[in-house]
């Protein structure tokens, strides 16, 4: 990094980071609690509803591959500012949404803005907080989960207060405006990576040739599949059990609040040791237990199952990125790897709401979808065994320019 002429203002920087993170899920998390109201206005099958989560996540996957290049060309601060503006405008456009296409297009545009931010922010964290990467990633991801909890819990009330679901969805543009103002205020504390770091960075093409990059991407994608599926379908699942939209939304908010807690606690636990595998296995066990509970006794102990899922998913998301960042020392290289990992991962995760929606349309039940996710999570425990820190250097060794030229 090119160092600033003055010491970075840590508190404003962390505050801005939190405000930015809060904006990365409301565009998706607000849909589920409002789904009944939306379907009363716009007739939608469950398969079509799944597109409201699938397509923005798919857009996130493709846009992730461009984030690092845009940041290298225009600068990290400017790129994130523009992405926040895109998210805010996409949310505001929902004020006039009257068709499924309107909702889908706004979700896709917001997803692209979200992807750009998520592809760039890990590199900023690694460069500005090199000795506290796990803790600050926990704070950042906690903010993301907190935004989801905030949207899930308050959107039905906002809709009742403002009169309809369109206003409830559009209201989240105000949060983007606040984050944009805070991000602009710390523009002097976000400096661009220097040429040496850029030259040493792995390019996307070389990452695609690294099996470990794909393993990390697949692991992230399978874990995120649980998140996207729960985000899209947990409220409708409990509405079918006889719950109101408001109560189902509050359950999702509770789940995401547990994600917030786990997003802080699990990275803090993992930061004590270079080997993150024990904590990864712990959160995967929590995810599996939560899905098994939804299958066997969804109505008897909903708070327990939602809590277990929240703890597991909330810890798995940041830990997956932390493990990826552990493989790289240079901030830009770490940022490029996490962008690649998230790009691959979101392309995988985008399919889970669609698959669950299709299962629901065919079988009239979400049970098979929860079972599939439990099996996938169990399979991930075997992947965790390969994340041994001593093996990291050999997976991403960078050849020197002369050595590369001799080949």
Which residues does each PLM region occupy?
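Helix-to-loop junctions at the C-terminal end of transmembrane segments
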Residues: 63-75, 262-275
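Intracellular juxtamembrane helix-capping segments at the cytosolic ends
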Residues: 116-129, 315-329
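Conserved MFS/SLC helix-loop-helix module at the cytosolic interface between two early adjacent transmembrane helices
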Residues: 62-101
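Helix-breaking motifs and short loop linkers at transmembrane-helix boundaries and internal kinks
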Residues: 43, 75, 96-101, 130, ...
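A late C-terminal transmembrane helix in Major Facilitator Superfamily
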Residues: 328-374
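Extracytoplasmic gate region of multi-pass secondary transporters
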Residues: 31-32, 211-263
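Helix-loop-helix hairpin linking two adjacent transmembrane segments in secondary transporters
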Residues: 102, 130-132, 138-191
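Cytoplasmic helix-loop-helix junction between adjacent transmembrane helices
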Residues: 106-143
